[in-house]
Every structure is written in structure tokens, then in C-alpha cells.
Amino acid sequence: MSEKHPGPLVVEGKLSDAERMKLESNYLRGTIAEDLNDGLTGGFKGDNFLLIRFHGMYQQDDRDIRAERAAQKLEPRHAMLLRCRLPGGVITTTQWQAIDKFAADNTIYGSIRLTNRQTFQFHGILKKNVKPVHQMLHSVGLDALATANDMNRNVLCTSNPYESQLHAEAYEWAKKISEHLLPRTRAYAEIWLDQEKVATTDEEPILGQTYLPRKFKTTVVIPPQNDIDLHANDMNFVAIAENGKLVGFNLLVGGGLSIEHGNKKTYARTASEFGYLPLEHTLAVAEAVVTTQRDWGNRTDRKNAKTKYTLERVGLETFKAEVERRAGIKFEPIRPYEFTGRGDRIGWVKGIDNNWHLTLFIENGRILDYPGRPLKTGLLEIAKIHQGEFRITANQNLIIASVPESQKVKIETLARDHGLMNAVSAQRENSMACVSFPTCPLAMAEAERFLPSFTDKVEAILEKHGIPDEHIVMRVTGCPNGCGRAMLAEIGLVGKAPGRYNLHLGGNRIGTRIPRMYKENITESDILASLDELVGRWAKEREAGEGFGDFTVRAGIIRPVLDPARDFWE
């Protein structure tokens, strides 16, 4: 151990089994191709169960019928989740029509699920349809490479519809970063696209033969919007503009929200400021952060392997100096920036290019034809006539982007006729959940299926206390992995067991503070009783413009989390 940093640069010890699996996989091939032809099981076996994640898929089963199938001596109804790589969430209407058709024809649930990482997922793909889905994506210029497991995941970019030039520049950087950090293995093309094996040996100059120690998430952020929740991510490029033109980025590193119940070595953490860099150094810096985490991240304990833990172990200054050394630059001081919100502006917004952008609220991102609200059909009909593109937001909503004045009435009519523009409360617009049951194998409590009716009850509490137009950033996540980003909410519910949640309070509206656990393992009625009391106090005692989370801290209801590595569990 050096005196310059608090812990070892590399954690010695027995490597986790995931490291063996990656090393023996022949650059992510495993025996996936052979397993595809095994009709005796609907799932993937052995290492392939985990290796398919590098190809953008998770093996799941329908937990609603798991016990019933076990009683019938049947294996679980295995089906895959597939997540598309879609940097910045931009998708053409031609691509949308293709994914709409695949969801209808080849998935169990028939839905498209928008995620809070600006992409879409298919749930319920049977094994026989796994290869066809990759080929369908490829046919319209998409893929699912590196959207799961130990790689740089889908790169997010602020869905800012009115600063069109700045958004266009930031979006281009999101795409460049995504491409630069992609794996170089030909396994994806060989297995799914039937491309010929070539004699040359695979090399992974950035990710290495065993890839990253853990998942890695990257964003490009355009202040004052923090819609992409930068503090949930390992590496964040905050856009700095002069006269409406992008000149460089502030770099923030080491955010992340996943924890393990009761494991005090795990904690949610906000990202740390490293400094400012001019545009021309962006890719070199991105690569340097990733390779530093590749070499220094903990490969013995996956629960402690993310960048946030590496940063705490070696020290921020040591990590930053190594990034500077590898990138060949010195960071300049952080340039001023501030965030004012992170919700989407639902409805029409006019961009500075005179095009219009229509943001549609999609509850929990689930696109399906509901009774009386055929959302999926409505979006398909819009896709057939819209000349621009769609943009998926990090709040699981959808923007019909770049609509000329002449098309505005036609598109709004389609949206209204299909229930896509039904009025909802500010509270509902600011509530979000992960998928959880019935498909997620990690789910401990309901989330997506729980949130709509729970939001009804929170709306009733706001109404009761005379503030029906107010909102509280509220999120539900079905397990402590935290996909619903509850650890950056003003009210965060984290699933503990069926019908039971940990209640976290004290985050803020702009997503820069981690909430602390207020009550543990409580029922919905307990949560509502607490919220009734606290919202009542907020309505009476708040200062002008004070959000619920800031109020709970100022009023002494909850202590703020100031240094998560040391005080998250206190």
C-alpha cells in the first residue's frame, strides 16, 4: 500500500467465478451456438446462461406460473429479455415499425417496454425466436451488443428537444463514445448474423480478454436538465456550451445506486467531479476511465466491483491522476453548471429550428394496446406518417421529434385518438418503476404492477392536504439492484419481500442527493400512513418552492446522506 491512496490499487485474492467464465468463453462465444439447437430445454445452460447477457439478453421465466409448472413437473417457462443498443434513445420510424411487428408476432407479452436507460426491451422471446430477433434488429441497422453484463452499457444523452443544435452535437458524442467502447469480438456477428469465422485472433484493446469487472454506465448530459440521472452512472460527460455551441465537457465519475440488503460494504454513491476537458480529448478520456476501472476494479467480489468502490478504495486523486496519465491530459477546473430539473416536458415544445417535438407520457414505459387506450397501435400509426424520428427518454417516455408545423394537427389527432395524450397529474408524470414481477428473476416485491394504484393513493394524499398540483419525485424498484433509480428519488421504495418495501426519504428534485432509509420492511399501508403525516407537514411548513425531499432534510425528519461510503447506513 502506498501512502498516496487509502487502499490497494488491485485487490488480490481468488477471482470470482464470473472471471473464469469470461476467460474460458473464447471472447464471449461459449457454446451459445450449439445451445441454440438444443430443443430439450427452453433455456440456455451452464455458462451460456450468463454469456448471453453480453449479447444483450437475460434468461427469465414467468414467475406468476413458476409454482404451477413445477407442480406439473415442467421446467420454468424460459423466455429471454432482449435490450437494444440505442445511444441517446434515438430510433427511426422505420426501425419502430420493425420492432412493433416483432413484439406482436414473436413475444409472449406482445409489448414494447421503454426503459429508463433510453432504449427498449422485448420480454418473452422464446428460444426459437432468439436468433431471428438479432437478425431483425440488424436488418434495420440496430443491435443488442453490450447492453448487459460487464461492458459499457447503452450510452445516455439528454433528450433536450428545444436546444436542437446542442442536442445534435451531444447526441453525436454519445454515439461516438458508444462505438469507441464497444467490444471488438466477432462473436456477436458469428452467432447471430451467420457471418463467417475469420482466422485472425480476437483482440479487445480497451475491454481486455475478461472485459470489465462489472457493468459500466455512461451519460452525456446537457444542463440544466438532469433527465438522465447522471449520479446513477459510472462516467458522465456534462456538456459545457458557449453561445449555444458545445465546447467541452465536465467529467464526473463513480456514481451508482445498486446495494445489497444488509451488506454495509455496499452503498449508493453520487458521482465525483474530476474536471473539465476540451472536446478533442473526449474519447481518450472515456477510454482512460474505462481501462483504469478495467485494471483496478475488484475482480474477487462482484458486490464490490463497480467504479464507485474502486474510487473509494484507491482515492479520488489517485484515480484521477491515472486517468490523466493514460489520456495524456491535465483536467482543467470544473466549469460552472447547474441543474434545475429532471422531468420531461410533456406535450408540445417548439425547438429553435422551428420544428415541434411532442413528448408523450408512457406510464412505466409499457407500450401495449390497453382496453380503450391502444397505445401500441397509436404509435405504429404515427410511425407510418412521421418523417422525423422517435426519441426514448430516461423517464421511460417517448418524444415524437422534429414534427413540421404542417404535420402537427395530424399527429396530435392520432395521439389523442389512441389515448396517448390523456391528461395525467404532475405526480404521475414524476413517478417511475422498474419491471420487477413477473419476469425479473431478482424481483423481491412488485414495482411496475404496483406503481399505478399506489400513485392513485399518493395523489389522494396530495389532494387531502390541499396541494393536488404538487409532485414528489417517487420511484419504486423491486430489489436493491435499483433499476428503478429509487436511490435518487425524494420518495424511494426498495422491494424487500412480497408486499414489503424499505422507504427512503431525503433525495431532492434534481437528483443530486442520495435518500436515506427512513423505515425498513414495511407494508403499503404503513408507507401511506407515513406519507400522509409527512406530506401534511410539508404542505403547512414548507418554504416557497421547497420540494418534499429538501423539506424532510430541513425539518430534521431525515439526516441527509453526505458521504455515502461512510454514512449511507448510519
From Swiss-Prot:
Residues given in the record as siroheme binding sites: 483
Cysteine disulfide partners in this protein: none
GO cellular component: sulfite reductase complex (NADPH)
Binding annotation for [4Fe-4S] cluster: 434, 440, 479, 483
Cofactor: how and how many bound: Binds 1 siroheme per subunit.
PROSITE patterns: NIR_SIR
Keyword Metal-binding (UniProt): yes
Cofactor(s), names only, from the UniProt record: siroheme; [4Fe-4S] cluster
Transmembrane regions: none
Subunit structure: Alpha(8)-beta(8). The alpha component is a flavoprotein, the beta component is a hemoprotein.
Biological role stated in the UniProt entry: Component of the sulfite reductase complex that catalyzes the 6-electron reduction of sulfite to sulfide. This is one of several activities required for the biosynthesis of L-cysteine from sulfate.
Family the UniProt entry places it in: Belongs to the nitrite and sulfite reductase 4Fe-4S domain family.
HAMAP family: CysI
Designated name of the protein: Sulfite reductase [NADPH] hemoprotein beta-component
Organism in which the protein naturally occurs: Salmonella schwarzengrund (strain CVM19633)
